[in-house]
A protein has these predicted regions:
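Short aromatic/hydrophobic "clamp" motif used to bind/position activated sugar donors
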Residues: 2
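Short, flexible, basic/aromatic active-site loop/helix in glycosyltransferases
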Residues: 51-84
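Membrane-interface aromatic/basic loop that binds lipid-linked glycans or pyrophosphate carriers
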Residues: 201-225
């Protein structure tokens, strides 16, 4: 077994042993995540839907969840659920599956590498599972909020990583359409947000340069890798 665990997480005592024991007896579960709580005890919903035409904006994502029966309320009520992807802050999988998948995609500096791994797993018919009877505390986002410079960098990288994911998993017109919709939706948010926030203004400036290179040169990589 291999466990990828964020350093800002706390596992329940001995929970890993019982989780592995259960997983050894239920071999259909191949990429495994667990329930993640924040420091206040609230569920962080550390899973989601793949990025596509129906999930690329928040408005469309809500209707997609309802249509597919994948609302947080429904999925959190189940002991085991099967989201598209699980958070990379806790991923348990067998070593041979990790090798079969080719490991983590190092084109991502941060963010979306978990979605990418799960997408490749689904493409190989490997089941992605979320277990609610095991849990950890994840101090989510604490490291990215230490100062304004880190905040701007991390939020910019989230947007860049979304474009990298699109470039990795879509081709031709589909890729161009998704890139364009993502640019439009993020631009609207950042431009209007810039009126009241210097942080959003700085993020927009960085993203604008990135978008220009992407559209004109087809360059959708992160300069952090």
């Amino acid at each position: 077994w291999l466990l990828f665990l964020n350093p800002d997480t706390i596992l329940d005592s001995n929970s890993l042993f019982s989780l592995i024991k259960y997983s050894n007896s239920n071999k259909e579960h191949r990429l495994i995540g667990i329930k993640q709580l924040n420091q206040n005890g609230s569920d962080t919903n550390a899973y989601g839907l793949f990025l596509d035409i129906w999930t690329i904006t928040g408005f469309l994502r809500i209707f997609n969840r309802i249509f597919r029966g994948l609302t947080y309320k429904k999925m959190n009520a189940e002991e085991i659920s099967f989201p598209d992807w699980i958070s990379g802050s806790f991923v348990l999988l067998r070593k041979f599956d990790f090798i079969k998948l080719g490991g983590w995609n190092e084109k991502y500096w941060m963010y979306y590498e978990d979605m990418d791994l799960c997408k490749r797993a689904k493409d190989l018919n490997l089941k992605v599972s979320l277990f609610k009877n095991w849990k950890c505390i994840h101090f989510h986002g604490e490291s990215s909020r230490k100062n304004k410079t880190i905040t701007v960098m991390s939020k910019t990288e989230v947007i860049k990583s979304a474009h990298i994911y699109i470039q990795n998993h879509y081709k031709n017109l589909s890729a161009l359409s998704l890139h364009s919709i993502l640019i439009l939706s993020r631009s609207i948010d950042l431009i209007f947000g810039s009126i009241f926030s210097t942080l959003k203004r700085k993020i927009f400036v960085k993203c604008f340069k990135y978008w220009k290179n992407g559209l004109l040169k087809g360059y959708w990589s992160s300069n952090k890798v």
